[in-house]
């Protein structure tokens, strides 16, 4: 299977397969922080909760592909959210990475958050803060980079046959499309978001 072939499917098919995979964030100084994905949500063009529900705009154009790129946006004017673009080019579809477990705590994580390391990236805004992902990463391709360069990519295989119990339920933190069961998380994992 080609590197991006499995990401060329609709977000509701891709989202559960990302569970257990590792998102790698490499910084220019060589530091790599790995985050095991523990919670995802799917958004597609026909979904009223999707940013591209009505039409393509400058803000959401990355959602229209190609797959394997990052769609990063700001919510509440404060926090960023990280999505992985899926499906064929021209079709708006993305998976929100809601929560992850970091393999290490970078120096910029405040002392009070270090007391509960599993909670450092337990929500989409917290995840972006922990990995220092912001709007400048919007449109980046998910691909490994050479030492001394910044990059974000995935490691591991898509979890077509999960090795841990997965819960499928409705999405949270939205007001439209709330009935769609397009949220997945690893059951009992301490890094899953609380709301």
From Swiss-Prot:
Alphabetized UniProt keyword annotations: DNA damage, DNA repair, Hydrolase
* Gene Ontology MF annotations: alkylbase DNA N-glycosylase activity; DNA binding
GO BP, one example?
A: base-excision repair
Q: Which family does it belong to?
A: Belongs to the DNA glycosylase MPG family.
- Which first-to-last residue range defines the signal peptide? none
Give EC number(s), comma-separated.
3.2.2.-
Question: NCBIfam families, alphabetically?
Answer: 3mg
Q: What is the lineage of its organism?
A: Bacteria, Bacillati, Cyanobacteriota, Cyanophyceae, Synechococcales
Species of origin reads: Synechococcus sp. (strain JA-3-3Ab) (Cyanobacteria bacterium Yellowstone A-Prime)
Q: HAMAP family, from UniProt?
A: 3MGH
Annotated protein name in UniProt: Putative 3-methyladenine DNA glycosylase
Q: What class of enzyme is it?
A: hydrolase
CDD domains xrefs: AAG
Show the Pfam families listed in the entry: Pur_DNA_glyco
């Amino acid at each position: 299977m080609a590197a991006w072939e499995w990401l060329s499917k609709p977000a509701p098919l891709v989202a559960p397969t990302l569970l257990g995979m590792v998102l790698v964030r490499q910084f220019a100084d060589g530091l790599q922080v790995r985050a095991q994905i523990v919670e995802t949500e799917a958004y597609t063009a026909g979904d009223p909760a999707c940013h591209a529900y009505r039409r393509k705009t400058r803000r959401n154009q990355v959602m229209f592909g190609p797959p394997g790129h990052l769609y990063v946006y700001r919510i509440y004017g404060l926090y960023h959210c990280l999505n992985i673009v899926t499906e064929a080019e021209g079709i708006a579809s993305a998976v929100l990475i809601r929560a992850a477990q970091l393999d290490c705590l970078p120096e910029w994580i405040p002392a009070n958050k270090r007391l509960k390391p599993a909670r450092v990236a337990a929500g989409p805004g917290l995840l972006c803060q922990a990995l220092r992902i912001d709007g400048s990463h919007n449109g980046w391709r998910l691909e490994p980079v050479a030492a001394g360069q910044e990059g974000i990519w995935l490691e591991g295989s898509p979890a077509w046959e999960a090795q841990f119990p997965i819960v499928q339920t409705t999405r949270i933190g939205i007001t439209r499309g709330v009935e769609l069961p397009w949220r997945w998380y690893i059951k009992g994992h301490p890094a899953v978001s609380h709301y």
